[in-house]
A protein has these predicted regions:
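Glycine-rich loop(s) and the adjacent beta-strand/alpha-helix scaffold that form part
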Residues: 26-29, 33, 40-56, 266, ...
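Conserved redox-cofactor binding core of oxidoreductases
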Residues: 60-62, 68, 72-74, 85-92, ...
Length: 589
């Protein structure tokens, strides 16, 4: 079949989630002709908006808005001596698909990392003596300062209508917020969400024990909000269907609610769904791209010429597309040469579930980000060097959903039949959780590459993930177990269960952790150790920009979306202010 060549555009955007929609609208506002290609289908709000009922089985069990492994499987192994096997069912992580991507079904915790997280290598060099940390750890600084990136955090938070309590306003510490956060130029756009009973209980005990709890920063908006693009987001009504669901009430910031409503009305923007990009096509000099090849909904292979190519798919698939396209040298863990695939990182979770016969937490009345957390156990805020590990966690009590199938039940409760129904009737609404979301460092032998054995439905190699837990992350888990246990003891439940990784634990792909995968095409100052410069521009192909979690050199305890938004907006500004005037490398190697 002959290839169909499309009309050339200024910018082609591959993937229409948070990064893709933000890059599209910013460049379209600058007057560029922007064409977006989305592998999945359209996700118009009419598909799931009120009065249609939320469907727990469809969304939370059958993963209605997630990609299927048949479309985008990866292969996984613990180490390079093993043969990786493909994922047949999502477990530890679950990427989205279609317009909105993972930004449609996210929990909407919108939190910044700390300045120490941004300059983690600098902190390690100052605080850790040689020999304390594993010698295969590969920590890096982000290639920008807090002062450079902070305005873009605030811009993204205005786009989302971020709700929360300010803790550090231009260096002044304010009561009720996070005293460890980096200085903010402006307060949170909106006040925090209301607390649920578990939040009140957790806050009281955490404060008593000397910690500094504050409300979860949220992109489920607490008040009606009109953002800088002119989009209106409705106040959250605490419906209880949030994490893994599109918002039925138009109250959760997503690409649909915060960006697409305005973007779709722009005459210089267009998008095509069910369009799977399979390769970035390079010019003969291999220093510039001339467009992308994709398969359309009818099965035709199409070529979309463009002056600028933006890869804005989910983190794993940005890395795969770079490898398939020959953009950047693939990483070799033996020689440590190459950059595409290195510094992959995930995260771990865990915590305690507490049961109280005499308390009703009314879990049906909640938002995804409803909760209290504290940041005392993050790098630089406690004595990690004396404990022999690097990293930390946000420790929180959140009530992200109140749906019955996901309800926690005491140990020994049957998982099916009459006993399950009786247990659900007895215990629904009588439990709360204390949870951890941890950092994860990058390592020499943890990486992504193309699998030599397994191909996708188009005959292209699957992405291969080589990943397992390291001693550093397991030491962190054990330290957090003691902290969470002390808080739980003070709360005095009737019974409880705890879940933490023991020393020696292997990565379990079957149990959900988070969709906070990062790294693989990281940003940095050195083209020998990073695939992208500070503006997410490929060091090797200067008209290719790659926004997303792939740019993180390691994972911090903060959820990644705020940073993905900020670095995307900073890159878009650099394209508008610098690249369009003088196309070429924005940072000299």
């Amino acid at each position: 079949m002959a290839q169909v060549t499309k009309k050339e555009v200024d910018v082609v955007v591959c993937g229409l989630g948070w990064a893709g929609s933000l890059m599209s609208i910013e460049l379209a506002l600058a007057g560029l002709d922007v064409r977006a290609l989305e592998r999945g289908g359209d996700r118009d709000y009419d598909e799931f908006a009120y009065p249609k009922p939320a469907d727990e089985y469809a969304y939370a069990v059958r993963n209605k808005v997630f990609a299927t492994p048949a479309e985008v499987a990866v292969t996984v192994r613990y180490n390079s001596s093993q043969t990786a096997l493909p994922t047949r069912k999502w477990g530890a992580f679950a990427p989205g698909t279609g317009v909105g991507g993972s930004g449609l079904h996210w929990t909407a915790v919108l939190i910044r990392p700390t300045p120490t997280d941004i300059k983690l290598k600098t902190y390690v060099d100052e605080a850790y003596k040689p020999g304390i940390l594993q010698d295969d750890m590969r920590v890096m600084d982000f290639p920008f300062s807090w002062e450079e990136i902070e305005p873009y955090y605030y811009k993204f938070e205005l786009i989302c209508g971020q709700s929360g309590n300010t803790g550090n306003l231009r260096g002044k510490i304010l009561e009720g917020g996070d005293p460890f956060e980096g200085p903010r130029s402006e307060p949170y756009p909106l006040p925090a969400l209301d607390d649920t009973l578990n939040n009140v209980m957790f806050k009281e005990v955490a404060t008593k024990l000397g910690y500094h709890p504050f409300p979860n920063p949220s992109a489920c908006v607490s008040r009606a909000w009109k953002n800088p693009y002119g989009n209106q987001i409705a106040p959250c009504n605490y419906c209880g269907y949030c994490s893994k669901y599109p918002c039925l009430n138009y109250s959760k910031a997503s690409p649909q609610t915060a960006v697409m409503d305005s973007l779709k009305r722009m005459p210089n923007f267009s998008y095509e769904v069910n369009a799977e990009v399979i390769k970035v096509v390079l010019n003969d000099d291999k220093k510039t791209a001339k467009g992308v090849s994709y398969i359309d909904a009818q099965g035709n292979e199409c070529f979309q010429p463009a002056k600028i190519v933006v890869l804005s798919s989910f983190q794993l698939y940005n890395v795969r597309l770079m490898l398939l396209s020959g953009i950047g040298k693939p990483y070799n863990p033996i020689t440590e040469e190459g950059v595409v695939g290195r510094n992959y990182a995930f995260l771990s979770n865990g915590g305690a579930t507490l049961f109280f016969k005499d308390k009703n937490f009314n879990p049906y009345a909640t938002a995804g980000a409803t909760g209290q957390m504290f940041n005392d156990i993050s790098p630089g805020n406690f004595d990690g060097p004396s404990l022999g590990f690097l990293g930390g966690a946000k420790i929180h009590s959140s009530q992200a959903t109140g749906t019955p199938i996901s309800t926690a039940l005491p140990k020994g409760t049957p998982t099916w039949g009459m006993g399950y129904k009786e247990g659900l009737e007895e215990w629904y609404g009588h439990s709360m959780k204390i949870s951890i979301t941890t950092t994860c460092q990058s390592y020499r032998d943890i990486y992504l590459d193309l699998d030599p054995n397994y191909n996708d439905h188009r005959g292209l190699p699957l992405l291969r993930m080589t990943f397992n837990w390291k001693e550093n992350e397991l030491k962190l888990q054990q330290h957090l177990k003691g902290i969470v246990g002390n808080i739980a003891k003070e709360l005095n439940p009737d019974s409880m269960s705890m879940s933490f990784l023991p020393m020696g634990a292997d990565f379990d792909l079957t149990k959900y952790v988070s969709t906070h995968n990062v790294g693989g095409a990281v940003m940095g100052d050195n083209p020998k150790t990073s695939a992208l410069n500070k503006y997410l521009q490929s060091w090797d192909v200067h008209n290719v920009f790659v926004p997303g979690g792939n740019a993180f050199p390691q994972n911090f305890q903060a959820n990644p979306t705020d940073t993905i938004g900020a670095i995307t907006l900073m890159a878009a500004q650099a394209i508008k202010d610098q690249y369009l005037k003088n196309p070429g490398p924005l940072v000299q190697a």
